[in-house]
Design a protein with these regions (language model features):
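Conserved acidic catalytic loop of the alpha/beta-hydrolase fold
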Residues: 110-130
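Catalytic active-site module of serine/aspartate enzymes centered on a nucleophile-bearing elbow/loop
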Residues: 309-358
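Glycine-rich "HGGG/HGxG" loop immediately N-terminal to the catalytic nucleophile
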Residues: 69-70, 92-106
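Conserved alpha/beta-hydrolase
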Residues: 80-98
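Alpha/beta-hydrolase
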Residues: 179-180, 187-271, 278
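Short beta-strand/loop motif that positions the catalytic acidic residue
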Residues: 276, 282-284, 288
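A catalytic-pocket lid/entrance helix-loop region that shapes and gates access to the active site
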Residues: 152-200
């Protein structure tokens, strides 16, 4: 264990159950860590921004069961100047794991309802009409479904590490790691992977075994050391040592996949969402074999939308916000400048389209 991780672990232990979010330090800023009740179940929000009049950016994390709250200070610090950034631990995840959501509530439809139930009071509280919705991996499924159901709530929708045809994506991901194992003559990996099979592993704990090999072969993270990730996690003031341990052991993701795996593996947005009425963006890693980029290209090509754009992160796999945080934030800031206008969102859209046609 590296000295950095040991130091971070010691600091996390000292923190024990005391969690907080650092003050913003600006006259019109906000820094809140608090629970809210969404459709009868308590769920936690982290809200940070230097100016409460800025547009709302809602981040929908992946998994299901994989929080983004612990990454807020690493991946969204600059964004706090331009947005009111909202990180939400969905039911069954992170700080929203307990008291334990009813098993029957762990459905895609319920998560979509939770998302809408979160957006509406946020808009009312901050006196705004629309949010910028960003979904990562599993969160990209929610984002697209919310965009289809309630486009009136959104400036635009962004899919990062976009899930498209989940069963086909899992098969491609499985074949990638198996091919890499054969290429390096890794007998142990070949034996383990051949015992697992393809997309069927998604509904079993075998998914997590496949993901460990995917991390090794760069299809999850291409340009980020796992030790650095652990250090970021352990230094998160919003999370207790218990929250950190749960993330490291993948407790929440295992809980969620065991209850939702059969439904989630069947997601196929190529069939379910052929068109959207809001601007759509895709943030895609050039080495992503978790939600393979070839399927994102296919979805991008087939999707009908008033405006759409595919933005490549050439040095990333499935985690562009972690692997290229500066570019991730620059792209969102530029997007906000063009699309997040309360007064004239359509004028901003037309101006952007004309500029790109020049």
């Amino acid at each position: 264990m590296s000295p950095t991780i040991i130091t971070s672990l010691f600091g996390s232990i000292l923190r024990l159950g005391r969690t907080y979010t650092p003050p913003m330090g600006t006259p019109n800023g906000i820094a809140e860590l608090q629970p809210v009740e969404l459709n009868g179940y308590p769920q936690w929000l982290l809200i940070r921004g230097q100016d409460v009049s800025r547009p709302l950016l809602l981040f929908l994390h992946g998994g299901p069961g994989e929080s983004n709250m612990w990454l807020a200070h690493y991946t969204m610090k600059e964004l706090e100047k331009y947005f009111v950034c909202v990180n939400w631990d969905q039911r069954g995840t992170g700080k929203s794991f307990r008291p334990g959501p009813p098993p029957e509530s762990m459905t895609i439809d319920q998560f979509v309802k939770d998302t809408i139930a979160l957006i509406e009071p946020l808009l009312a509280r901050f006196g705004q009409q629309k949010v910028l919705l960003l979904g990562h991996s599993w969160g990209s499924v929610l984002a697209m479904k919310v965009a289809a159901a309630r486009p009136d709530l959104l400036f635009a929708v962004i899919g990062m590490g976009q899930v498209v045809d989940n069963r086909r994506g899992e098969d491609l991901s499985y074949r990638y790691v198996l091919e890499r194992a054969h290429a390096e003559h890794n007998r142990k990996a070949i034996r383990i992977l051949e015992q697992l099979g393809g997309s069927d592993t998604f509904r079993k704990d075998g998914k997590f075994i496949q993901r460990r090999w995917l991390v090794r072969y760069g299809g999850m993270m291409h340009a980020l050391d796992t030790g650095a990730v652990v250090s970021i996690l352990l230094n998160t003031p919003e999370w207790s040592i218990g929250d950190c341990i749960s993330a490291l052991t993948m407790r929440d993701m295992k809980f969620s996949i065991r209850r939702m795996g059969d439904e989630v593996i069947g997601v196929n947005l190529l069939q379910e969402i052929p068109e959207l009425s809001v601007p759509v963006f895709f943030f895609t890693g050039g080495y992503d074999y978790t939600t393979p980029f070839v399927l994102v290209e296919q979805f991008y090509a087939s999707l009908h939308a008033p405006y759409k754009k595919l933005i490549w992160f050439e040095h990333s796999a499935h985690m562009p916000h972690m692997e290229e945080p500066d570019k991730f934030q620059r792209e969102l800031i530029a997007l906000a400048d063009e699309f997040c206008s309360e007064k004239h969102p359509q004028d901003a859209l037309v101006a952007t389209m004309k500029k790109e046609q020049l």
